[in-house]
Amino acid sequence: MRNVPNYHHSYFILFIIILFLAFSVYASNFSATESLTISSNKTIISPSQIFELGFFNPDSSSRWYLGIWYKIIPIRTYVWVANRDNPLSSSNGTLKISDNNLVIFDQSDRPVWSTNITGGDVRSPVAAELLDYGNFVLRDSKNNKPSGFLWQSFDFPTDTLLSDMKMGWDNKSGGFNRILRSWKTTDDPSSGDFSTKLRTSGFPEFYIYNKESITYRSGPWLGNRFSSVPGMKPVDYIDNSFTENNQQVVYSYRVNKTNIYSILSLSSTGLLQRLTWMEAAQSWKQLWYSPKDLCDNYKECGNYGYCDANTSPICNCIKGFEPMNEQAALRDDSVGCVRKTKLSCDGRDGFVRLKKMRLPDTTETSVDKGIGLKECEERCLKGCNCTAFANTDIRNGGSGCVIWSGGLFDIRNYAKGGQDLYVRVAAGDLEDKRIKSKKIIGSSIGVSILLLLSFIIFHFWKRKQKRSITIQTPIVDLVRSQDSLMNELVKASRSYTSKENKTDYLELPLMEWKALAMATNNFSTDNKLGQGGFGIVYKGMLLDGKEIAVKRLSKMSSQGTDEFMNEVRLIAKLQHINLVRLLGCCVDKGEKMLIYEYLENLSLDSHLFDQTRSSNLNWQKRFDIINGIARGLLYLHQDSRCRIIHRDLKASNVLLDKNMTPKISDFGMARIFGREETEANTRRVVGTYGYMSPEYAMDGIFSMKSDVFSFGVLLLEIISGKRNKGFYNSNRDLNLLGFVWRHWKEGKELEIVDPINIDALSSEFPTHEILRCIQIGLLCVQERAEDRPVMSSVMVMLGSETTAIPQPKRPGFCVGRSSLEVDSSSSTQRDDECTVNQVTLSVIDAR
């Protein structure tokens, strides 16, 4: 007899599934007779199941919030939070419509959040609905059009701007000044320190505030992007717009393609970033972010100064201006500049054209979008208070006019992007074109004669060389044994040593030996801050009271000159808030010294591995330090003019300023990479044991992934408070990586955390954030370089709790004791013991 399908049984199962779904979620509508409770685990879902609204508790804490997140994206990404500053303290909260308002009630039936619509504005009955573009609205139940909206979440953003959402001032909708405010931390939705605000005076622009202080300025809207965001390049699926009229001054964007999801968010560390979901990679991709480097800091170079990240010092005076204060030893242009010659205001003044610039702060400006550049110049010359002018729109050759009537500050120069800025200067500071032409002609003739003489001399020298025996000097043998960059640096240092009084090569302020001797109390041991592989670092004070750190190169070091020239060459061109700042150098009396900014809190290792000082490093400070180091490394790998591999990242090479801001230092081992290069090989393996990647320590192969490995080791050291090198666990583990990996596999990750953090945080211990950091650290120290993430991915993982993080594979140099050493009664080794090349009895440590 044939088997007959049991259709009744199938229908019953289908009925149960439908019934379960009905009790699990709501539709997009939410009526006055319904309620949403935490205990029921019910949610409201938009019609196309793109967004979802419900209660959530980050990090499995006791704090409950009402929020909106992407349902269609597998990673939980929150885009709006209702009661961010007044969470529910238990899981007995309820959302319901009460008195024609959306209200959240706690377990005692007390309201903790409400839409606060007054009675006169409400038309009964009302309903709530979650729309497909992420807007949660309270509306007239008989009118589902925008005209029927009584309240909407889009008017009260948190840290995220969605498609069709507005940021800025909107008097049209009732006087809303919509701002973004960051989460306090990645696991705490409460209002953080950072916010975006719009200034409508002059030429409107957005500012990022850290509490009450401005940290970054977007620059004015130039028709297709903001002046200070050159990375805000047009993409085919995003339409950006900026509306400015009597009713509103707002920025918004629209994602014009289906199945593409993109957000603008303000992170808990103050980064404004554009993220787009990549379906293939199942992760958020960071398209751009701001602020990006030291030049993005607000008013970094003072009045009439401009910042250029590719020069040293980064602050420069506009032509026709000079530094406000000439310091006796080291010049500091951040104080600003002043005019060399006073304006005449009689029509003889002219303009200096600055290309590829970020426009100055536009608070004191006047705008006329109806005239062109020529009329703008004429208008500027007629008013003596006019200091500069530019186009308001850079599209189609430029149009409109903006005129500055006060000081010019917060200007920077870009390698790419930016626009022309015309700065008014006195006639005497404008070089006559005819004189300039004569100089060029004279210089050309002189150069031609010099080249001819050089050719003749070279010809006779070459003939003489053919008759002589080639002699290889010891220094040439040494040079040939080095890699290509070191060849270049040794040659440069040799040629430079014979010309110690010339400054063209370094483009840095040079100081005399006696000035540094005086500043450091004749290099007194009382002024000694520390000692590295190539010399001693002293604390010093200049005559103007400025504190400095002086790195005095050891005369006994055979490699010191190479590293000195390398460090000068690299750091002079690197400017970032998380990189140590080089102020000058000294090549005098047979000595070579570097002068850095003095950082009050010394190196990270002096705090991290000190039993007393480590108590000052709570988890939030450690997390901020981790983020800062990551940003500095990302700048070296991706955002600087030349790609740089540090090769010696470790705790002692991270310095801390008075605010505990981390700054990567010691570039003596660093290598410059071409943009197309991915890895290089060297026969001279340098670095520090405990931080070297396997491929570098064993084969001399290094790349960005080598630095990522070092960063991973450092991250795990910061979390655990233990050194990787010299770590000794008498039971099973011979290094920190093995210790962390074993606890990770056993599900006991939190046991590796420095106990000081656990004691300090007690009930508010951010478990989820720390677990993410441990996982990121393990990803960075994976044995195979291709498995490790790049630093841009690390930054995204650190900055967003919603980003998917892969499961890590075995770390490099992860070695544990064999079972014979652990327990003499056992003759077998555990299968999950992590080894390298099956060696279990040898001590193998990351170099």
Curated annotation (Swiss-Prot):
Main location as per UniProt: membrane
Reactions performed catalytically: L-seryl-[protein] + ATP = O-phospho-L-seryl-[protein] + ADP + H(+); L-threonyl-[protein] + ATP = O-phospho-L-threonyl-[protein] + ADP + H(+)
EC number: 2.7.11.1
Record-listed ATP binding positions: L529, G530, Q531, G532, G533, F534, G535, I536, V537, K551
Start and end residues of each EGF-like domain: 291-327
Protein kinase domain boundaries: 523-813
Entry protein name: Receptor-like serine/threonine-protein kinase SD1-6
Source organism of the structure: Arabidopsis thaliana
